């Protein structure tokens, strides 16, 4: 008869959790950031606010975003005029859209990850689904399980309304699941649609306008598992460690509240400063055990909350401009997609590394960091180890 310890050991994987495949997806509707101020003030019937429009135009110009993708088209907004008002009761109509569209967009990203993985979807043992919107029962995890045709016994984890840091959270959870369950293959999906947050402008709430200038829609998916099957599964990044912390003196810096008008966001101006002055501590705690203290010697995947956050982190740590190349590229091409962003950046980095002939998926470097920043202020710090492409 085996002992409890022998049984527990047999249930666990031998190697570290590894990202085995990545997939991304966006809605087909692409928005040109340079023309967005005109479109936004026209569609929200706010042309009578020229000064506010010019403020918003400057926000769009300073965002360092070229394009975003949005499920909300002009036709859909005309069908739902309450979305275009600043504080009109509209939650039911928004909810009807997101409970269906969030899982659908997640399905597109998941199918691309599964295709790259090369294994039958019947081998998926766990599902983690993350989204900021569309709370329902059964949840988006249930809907995605049905849409993909996963086994009914798949073990599901649903994470609602975590916000922009959650791209790190899902990897932390996937790491624990993969390493503590032998042969586990975890499908992770982050799907974000701004239907729940879109609204017209208001002179007294400029923080709401900031969100209208930054946020876009997208879904990212990864397959995570330990002990890759040689010749079939190709590891991309090893997840070495993961930590979460609440920054000191940051209460109320980023808040989101679900109301009859949808999800409202409130931001303090000093969010970039709060993150940049605390980020070194998270880095030291994560990399001191590895003997690493040169932040230019690692590759970087940072949630692109906005250009000001990236600029101040870069300055605080004396990072070379190329360190945040992949992060800035995703911000430029997609905007801030909340939890999905870091998965897009993982994808961008491994593709760019292969294209540029680097020896690893992490721009030729062995070690790297993935940061998620969001409400709380909460910071997720994930240490990654790259592999040869």
Curated annotation (Swiss-Prot):
Pfam families: Chal_sti_synt_C, Chal_sti_synt_N
Keyword Transferase: yes
EC nos: 2.3.1.74
Superkingdom, natural source: Eukaryota
Transmembrane segment boundaries: none
SUPFAM superfamilies: Thiolase-like
Catalysed conversion reaction: (E)-4-coumaroyl-CoA + 3 malonyl-CoA + 3 H(+) = 2',4,4',6'-tetrahydroxychalcone + 3 CO2 + 4 CoA
Active-site residue numbers: 164
Entry's Gene Ontology molecular function annotations: naringenin-chalcone synthase activity
Enzyme class, spelled out: transferase
Keyword line: Acyltransferase, Flavonoid biosynthesis, Transferase
GO process terms (BP): flavonoid biosynthetic process; polyketide biosynthetic process
Pathway: Secondary metabolite biosynthesis; flavonoid biosynthesis
PANTHER family (alphabetical): CHALCONE SYNTHASE 1, HYDROXYMETHYLGLUTARYL-COA SYNTHASE
Recorded family membership: Belongs to the thiolase-like superfamily. Chalcone/stilbene synthases family.
Stated role: The primary product of this enzyme is 4,2',4',6'-tetrahydroxychalcone (also termed naringenin-chalcone or chalcone) which can under specific conditions spontaneously isomerize into naringenin.
Name of the protein in its database record: Chalcone synthase 1
Species this chain originates from: Daucus carota (Wild carrot)
Gene symbol of the encoding locus: CHS1
